[in-house]
Regions:
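Gly/Pro-enriched, hydrophobic low-complexity segments
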Residues: 130-198
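Short, solvent-exposed recognition patches
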Residues: 198-282, 295
Length: 310
């Protein structure tokens, strides 16, 4: 059953509103510039998590903390462009990054000007979430090949109060929902200790070997572009895996190809937003992994073209 509020109705003929894109861009700016604290729940097919997220800007750099409120204490801290992870039973570590991936939905950090040629931003109206009046906006791909979002944005602060990720049938895959929040400079003051804390060392991630591949997809959804490629030797298989990573600024997927083995098999699996599609063709195992509907993943896989080795 869809989690979309039954009280929210909108016309199927609603047209894209240019001001909706501007509002979404304001949400992007507010989320990264204000001092605030959110208590929220994250709901998906695996269950419900209760979390707290704090964000401030100190000395012109972002400082943020994500804390799991139930069960074992899991904490993620951002200072500048370094993200540190603390979890029971694991050695703490730090990675480079622009924001805490598991905090606010990725949509919040998106450049909506870049998305505008490929997505419609549709104003749905206004409703209340967390006792706040919110603008409601749908973010829908124009070509119908991707998932969509509905955003409930506080009209005053422009912070997201609720974000639903929907599949192509309108079923809710994930929901971010704020329970309570605070916006004031005291949030920044309470985070001063994090600004001075000793964080774990930066973990170096080995880069894959750059290479020219003899394959490429002949079709990908409009707006996606290749952002990296690599060849890696994985411990679980004997042959190297060649990978291309694509993104449209909102969703991403990778195309991974290795020589087929006796253990290779075809499969199509979707868990929440993530689809894994594996096919065998021309003695190669083609695996699409990413935030795509299964039908789109299959179309990309079927479009892979191999050229003769030089």
């Amino acid at each position: 059953m869809s989690l979309v509020a039954g009280s929210l109705f909108f016309s199927a003929n609603a047209s894209a509103d240019l001001s909706s894109g501007a509002l979404l861009q304001q949400m992007n700016m507010a989320s990264q510039s204000l001092n605030y604290e959110l208590a929220f729940v994250s709901i998906n097919k695996q269950g419900v998590e209760s979390l707290r997220y704090r964000h401030a800007r100190l000395d012109k750099q972002p400082l943020a903390q994500l804390l799991q409120m139930d069960g074992p204490r899991r904490e993620v801290v951002q200072r500048g462009n370094e993200i540190s992870y603390f979890e029971p039973g694991l050695e703490p570590f730090t990675l480079n990054g622009d924001y805490i991936v598991d905090s606010l939905p990725a949509l919040v950090y998106t450049d909506f000007k870049r998305l505008s040629p490929y997505y419609d931003f549709i104003s749905v109206g206004r409703t209340r979430i967390a006792d706040r009046l919110c603008e409601v906006i749908r973010v829908v791909a124009k070509d119908g090949t991707r998932y969509s979002y509905i955003v409930w944005m506080d009209t005053e602060t422009k912070l997201p109060m609720r974000v639903d990720l929907l599949d192509r049938d309108g079923e809710t895959l994930e929901q971010f929902r704020v329970i309570s929040f605070t916006v004031n400079n005291q949030v920044g003051s309470s985070m001063q200790s994090l600004a001075k804390a000793n964080l774990p060392p930066l973990l170096s991630v080995p880069a894959g070997d750059a290479a020219n591949f003899n394959w490429a997809p002949s079709w990908i959804p409009q707006g996606f572009s290749e952002i990296s490629s690599s060849r890696r030797q994985l411990p679980t298989i004997e042959t190297a895996v060649e990978s291309r990573l694509y993104s449209d600024g909102l969703f991403s997927f990778s195309v991974n190809i290795n020589r087929a083995t006796a253990n290779s098999s075809e499969q199509m699996l979707r868990t929440g937003r993530r689809t894994v599609s594996s096919t065998i063709r021309d003695n190669a195992e083609i695996t699409i992994v990413g935030e795509l509907p299964p039908q789109t993943a299959k179309r990309i896989s079927d479009s892979i073209k191999f050229r003769a080795a030089q």
